[in-house]
């Protein structure tokens, strides 16, 4: 179930301030954030935002097709290394 349209999209204030400050600065730096719940706005396009995945900050370059999605969607928290190999030959 999605968010109500009357509420509008959510973005943390501290993240929005960092993006606006970056817009005024001539050099682009990576913006670190722990806010996986924030929605990607059109003003974020072209910036690299490092999203925390519980262990490290994953750099995410914001592109046009990412607008409307959440930052956490692009920084997976779980690492899947596959199921154990089938060892039927070694059991005989």
Curated annotation (Swiss-Prot):
The keyword RNA-binding applies. Keywords: Ribonucleoprotein, Ribosomal protein, RNA-binding, rRNA-binding. It comes from the Bacteria. One of its GO terms (molecular function) is structural constituent of ribosome. One of its GO terms (cellular component) is cytoplasm. GO terms for biological process: ribosomal small subunit assembly; translation. Coiled coil: none annotated. The keyword Ribosomal protein applies. PANTHER family: RIBOSOMAL PROTEIN S19P FAMILY MEMBER, SMALL RIBOSOMAL SUBUNIT PROTEIN US19M. Protein S19 forms a complex with S13 that binds strongly to the 16S ribosomal RNA. Belongs to the universal ribosomal protein uS19 family. NCBIfam families: rpsS_bact. This is Small ribosomal subunit protein uS19. The lineage of its organism: Bacteria, Bacillati, Bacillota, Bacilli, Lactobacillales. The gene is rpsS.
